[in-house]
Each structure stands twice: as structure tokens, then as C-alpha cells.
Amino acid sequence: AASDVYKRQKERFDKDNFIKNLLLDNLLLVDIYNRAKKLHIEVEARRLVFILETNPDKNSGALESVKSLLGTKSGDFITAVDEKNIIIVKELAPGEDYAQMNKVAATILEAAGRDEEGKTHVAYGTIVKEIKEVSRSYKEARMAMDVGKIFSAENDIYAYSSLGIGRLIYQLPIPLCKMFIKEIFGNKSPDDFDEETLTTINKFFENSLNVSETSRQLYIHRNTLVYRLDKLQKSTGLDLRVFEDAITFKIALMVVQYMKYMETLDY
């Protein structure tokens, strides 16, 4: 019996090790198939990778909670790569698609326990059909986590397949971003605008550049809004009532968000 327990533990350790190396692209193609066969891991199953990022102070419990939630399914693998991130490689049942995966993401979030500081997020990649593609789904989930935290910080679930324009901005080299911002704003940065101006701009975008609706929601007179937009046009040369200028401004704000996020990362 003791040897059985040892065997089971060794197999679990070997599987965990295999999945970690698979995610990090540390295996040759031939090794992937040989080791998967030895460990009785299905090579042609549909899978998707989730990343759960939690508050390190709460993480010890999160891993166990997620394991007890999903760990009963033999095709799913759950592993922690560092003190903040838990990786779930989920095997999909026939007919399961992204709508179900979004529900799984919500369940994972519940299991981990939402924290008030907003440091708990789940991101996931795309569905892959072969074991060798799992690392791609993992990279996509990683990117979704970054892009989501930069551009949709108010949400806590990020799907790689719906990152929108943020995905494009995230791939831009920082020097190019700086050049773009300088070209549009000169030595100013959109950050330099006061809170009132930024609130006005964001509300105006939310309401599809509709002056009446924006002024109503901001509880200000229409003329006050027009005055603010005129003032903005004077200082930037961009008239947000003109679609093309509005797009330029919106992208510039997103580029600045991205640059700020990259600065906060510990290099």
C-alpha cells in the first residue's frame, strides 16, 4: 500500500513537472509525445489555459480551493508557477465552447475568493486541439492578463479572444508610443489634464460623442460642455466632436495607459 501511495505521488509530481515544462516551452516535440504517453495524458484533447492571479497573502488557500473545485476531473491540471499565479489547464468536454469557459473563469474567481483590493483576476487563452499547442494558450492567457489589467482594470475576467484594440497597442514598442504622443500633444501628456477635463472626455466617448447626452449625464449646461471641448481643442488642436480627432485622442489615452503600466513593472 505504501508503494502504491508513493507511485501515485510520483506520478502526480511527474505530471506536474511535465505540465510546467510544457507551458514554458522547455520540451522538444518528440519528448512531449513520449512523456505524455508514459504519463497517460491524452495528446489530442481540446484544452484551454486559465491563469488565476491572486493576492499573494491569500494565495495559499486559493490553490487548494481551486484544486478542490476542478481537481476531481482527471483531464485537468492545476499548478502554481509562483506565489501569485495559479495555472489551470482545462480539458473541454465535446460541445463546450468559450461561453462555458467564461462561466468556468467566474467559478475559479469565486473559488479563489474575490478580494476588496481588486488584485484577483482570471485570464484565459484560446482553445487548442493538441498537447503541443498548450503553451500557446498559456502565452495568450498571459497576454490577456496584461492587456486586461491595462485597459479594463474594472473587470476581473479577461479573454484573449476579446481584447480589442488593446491587443494592438500592447504590441507597440515604447519608443514608437512616445513618438506618437509627442506628435499629438507636443511636450504635454494627456495625463496633464485635470480630473474635470478627463471625466468630461471619458463621458463624451461613453456617449458616442453626443453633446446633449453627455451634458445631461455630467449635470452641466450644454454650453459649459461646448466651452470645455473648445478649450481642449485650443490646447491640443483636436476637436473631439470630429470623429477622426476623437479616434486619435482615444488611442492616445490608451497608449499613455499602456506606457504607464510598462513603467510600473519591475524590470
Regions found by a protein language model. Give the residues of each.
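Amphipathic HAMP/coiled-coil signal-transducing linker helices
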Residues: 9-23
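Short, small-residue-biased leader/transition segments that mark boundaries at the very start
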Residues: 1-6
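Cytosolic nucleotide-utilizing catalytic cores of signal-transduction proteins
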Residues: 29-49, 53-267
